[in-house]
Swiss-Prot record:
Signal sequence, renumbered to the chain: none
Record has Ribosomal protein as a keyword: yes
Protein name as catalogued: Small ribosomal subunit protein bS16
Domain of life: Bacteria
Chain intervals for the UniProt region annotation (Disordered): 79-123
A molecular function GO annotation: structural constituent of ribosome
Family: Belongs to the bacterial ribosomal protein bS16 family.
Pfam families: Ribosomal_S16
Keyword Nucleus annotated: no
A biological process term (GO) from this entry: translation
Name of encoding gene: rpsP
Keyword annotations: Ribonucleoprotein, Ribosomal protein
Annotated Gene Ontology cellular component terms: cytoplasm; small ribosomal subunit
HAMAP family (alphabetical): Ribosomal_bS16 (MF_00385)
Amino acid sequence: MALKIRLARAGSKKRPYYHVVVADVRAPRDGRFIETVGSWNPVLPKDAERVKLDAERIQHWIAQGAQPTDRVLRFLDQAGIAKRPSRNNPTKGEPGKKAQERLALAKQAEEEAAAKAAEAASE
């Protein structure tokens, strides 16, 4: 049985509240779960009351093979329970092809202007 440590939504409309639960991957998001190991109230301001986790039980379930979802792994990383590897995609932040062409043309024009200025200064 594959297990996940994930969020199960509770609360009312426009007032979300999430339970951090250990559940079978085949179970519905808000359906059957094995154990509640924490909670997250995104409505509260950023303080200690916003995320509550039972570190001992979470470590037990991780040792049993439960995989935390990305959002839960962020909480665990902040609490110092588990380490979330940083993702690195250096090409994602680069400008597109046309923007790179424009930058190259602008740089070339700037170099030509600097060369003309240096030539005029040497005369």
